[in-house]
């Protein structure tokens, strides 16, 4: 059998790069060292800042975190507070009295009806204050001349049992406007998906101008976590993030010890946090590294080369020179690349890079 010089040179170069002729006691530290060398050879060293000696870090807003994976710091998080403005859900005019949920006025009572739809954000947060802004159209003289025995404005909410009074207090307001501050006991009203408010103002007139549309102002903050949520947050984090491929490795049935004695493709879950590069390589957080491992104890005489396109089995050695000792190595041309996303400025810019010939697809005794 005559081996072509080009094939011989290719196999020699593959052996030099893979470093697969290791003993059966191949440890994790050696694999990690080899992986780090392959990454540094393909991507170069990470950009360093002037003080910490690590990749440059800039603090990012929480919404810029990648894939929900955030680096935890010892600094306290900012309180989640917000302000929301709600307008009536329907836009009926004064002339369109029959529109469902629109603006309606009963002249004999001066009753105005408004339908609000609080957002999911408001319903999931704790309301700390709420005000209803209503355009009365009355100047201060008209307000003072009104009957003092009855309040100028009454606020009611439509419930299953009929209209119910809402406790409010009048606050400072611009001319021709009224600001009704809802009492704390009325804050749960904003947790309903539909809120129907009835405002009674006998002296007020209906106005269909857009600039006189009433609105609700609600201030909210995040709810205090429950006992279960606090327990989940206080649980210690795993040393590295798990991936679906790593879970499949754990869930597969156990193998016979003899299966690991011969040349085979081994797998190792590696995270960039474990390598100290989680601030440089931001995606993926981890990957499954495949490499060749095992011995080649089969006889080395009179075995043909494998058929092109069909990877050899672990018991099918491939020889360079007759009489040479075979070594468990990756089949030439079967290495797969890994695409990663890196950053050198803490997340303001990203770069897609490729680490070629990193993951082994097929192993053989060469």
Swiss-Prot record:
The keyword Zinc does not apply. Dimeric, linked by one or more disulfide bonds. Activin B is a dimer of alpha and beta-B. Inhibin A is a dimer of alpha and beta-A. Inhibin B is a dimer of alpha and beta-B. Interacts with TGFBR3L; this interaction regulates female fertility. PANTHER family: INHIBIN ALPHA CHAIN, TGF-BETA FAMILY. Mainly expressed in ovary and testis. Alpha- and beta-B-subunits are the predominant forms found in testis. Also found in placenta, pituitary, adrenal gland, bone marrow, kidney, spinal cord and brain. Its main location: secreted. Glycans are attached at residues 147, 269. Gene3D superfamilies: Cystine-knot cytokines. Disulfide bonds join 263-328, 292-363, 296-365. The keyword Zinc-finger does not apply. The record marks 63-64, 233-234 as: Cleavage. Belongs to the TGF-beta family. Inhibins and activins inhibit and activate, respectively, the secretion of follitropin by the pituitary gland. Inhibins/activins are involved in regulating a number of diverse functions such as hypothalamic and pituitary hormone secretion, gonadal hormone secretion, germ cell development and maturation, erythroid differentiation, insulin secretion, nerve cell survival, embryonic axial development or bone growth, depending on their subunit composition. Inhibins appear to oppose the functions of activins. Inhibin A is a dimer of alpha/INHA and beta-A/INHBA that functions as a feedback regulator in the hypothalamic-pituitary-gonadal (HPG) axis. Inhibits the secretion of FSH from the anterior pituitary gland by acting on pituitary gonadotrope cells. Antagonizes activin A by binding to the proteoglycan, betaglycan, and forming a stable complex with and, thereby, sequestering type II activin receptors while excluding type I receptor. GO terms for cellular component: extracellular space; inhibin A complex; inhibin B complex; inhibin-betaglycan-ActRII complex; neuronal cell body; photoreceptor inner segment; photoreceptor outer segment. Coiled coil: none annotated. SMART domains: TGFB. The gene is Inha. GO terms for biological process: hemoglobin biosynthetic process; male gonad development; negative regulation of follicle-stimulating hormone secretion; ovarian follicle development; regulation of cell cycle; regulation of cell population proliferation. Pfam families: TGF_beta. Residues 21-63, 64-233 form a propeptide. Residues 1-20 form the signal peptide. Proteolytic processing yields a number of bioactive forms, consisting either solely of the mature alpha chain, of the most N-terminal propeptide linked through a disulfide bond to the mature alpha chain, or of the entire proprotein. This is Inhibin alpha chain.
